[in-house]
Amino acid sequence: MRFKKTISIALALGLLLLSLMAFQMFQKTQLVMFDSISFNMPLESFEKVFGKPNEIVEETETGYHNPWRSKDPYLYKTGRLFYDYENFKWKGYSGRVTFTFSKSHRLQGAAVYFPVTSKAQQKEIFYQMIQDMKAEIEALPDYQSMTTDTVGLYDDGYRYKVKLKGQMIELWIDVYPTEYEDDDNPDNNQYNIRIDQSRLE
């Protein structure tokens, strides 16, 4: 009897833990820079708030009819979607944003690209944008604390790992410069500041 009681208690605790994990997975976490938009938001609800995108891209991956020999490749749709919006504005900056939706069509993350005209302007705006981002993070209603790591090809960007009250899953925000330089034709050079948002799951 005592053994059965112990098993019952263990099963009950296991179910409670699974319920808490599921709650954490689907608990609303607001995205920084976007009012009324949260992670795990259903696609239909998202469109009502943010509107129709300029472009929708369906993710595809390569599969093989004979996976043992990687022969007869074919493309298949994974179910994930990318919603692209042009003319996104934030604190006087203009750019574009791509939202990523999971196979179940729930919001997974966002990537924002702010173009700049030169590397000098990129450096100037980047450090101002960092200050703006810190202020935005600390203004979150459930903000608790934040740690910072370096990211980017040359460790010239920052990753903010944000702890939120009542949640075990961290909010990660990466802010870093990106560049494409054409040695043959400098007029094709492209400089951006990119901001990624995701939840560590």
Locate predicted features.
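Long, charged/polar, surface-exposed segments that mediate recognition or autoinhibition
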Residues: 86-155
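Short amphipathic beta-strand and strand-loop transition segments with alternating hydrophobic
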Residues: 67-72, 98, 147-149, 172-184
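Bacterial Sec-dependent signal peptides at the C-terminal "C-region" and cleavage site
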Residues: 14-29
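An acidic-aromatic pocket/loop used at catalytic or ligand-binding sites
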Residues: 156-201
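N-terminal Sec-pathway targeting helices
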Residues: 1-13
